Amino acid sequence: MAKVALIQRELKREKLVAKYAKKYVQLKAIAGDAKRSDAEREAARLGLQKLPRNANPTRQRNRCAITGRPRGTFRQFGLARAKIREMAFAGDIPGITKASW
């Protein structure tokens, strides 16, 4: 089980990313547009630098919804591999069965 503080920090990052998402996308588009003037592109880069660090979506980490484990998390389920295994064997995830051939 991950520390509660780490899970809360990740939730805080999610909120910041959502809050600045529109502005971030607009500034990235301007900064990457070769048709714009150098001054406009530089202003967009400075605008990106002024955003909070945690507003950058690449700083987010996928975590297990139950345990908060940061590694071995399957996007499809939002769970860590160990929890998927436990829940699959218990029959809590519909359509998942143990492989046998």
From Swiss-Prot:
Keywords: Ribonucleoprotein, Ribosomal protein, RNA-binding, rRNA-binding. InterPro entries: Ribosomal_uS14, Ribosomal_uS14_bac/plastid. Transmembrane segments: none annotated. Residues 33-44 have a biased composition (Basic and acidic residues). GO terms for molecular function: rRNA binding; structural constituent of ribosome. It comes from the Bacteria. Pfam families: Ribosomal_S14. Belongs to the universal ribosomal protein uS14 family. Part of the 30S ribosomal subunit. Contacts proteins S3 and S10. NCBIfam families: PRK08881.1. Binds 16S rRNA, required for the assembly of 30S particles and may also be responsible for determining the conformation of the 16S rRNA at the A site. HAMAP family: Ribosomal_uS14_1 (MF_00537). This is Small ribosomal subunit protein uS14. It comes from Verminephrobacter eiseniae (strain EF01-2). The gene is rpsN.
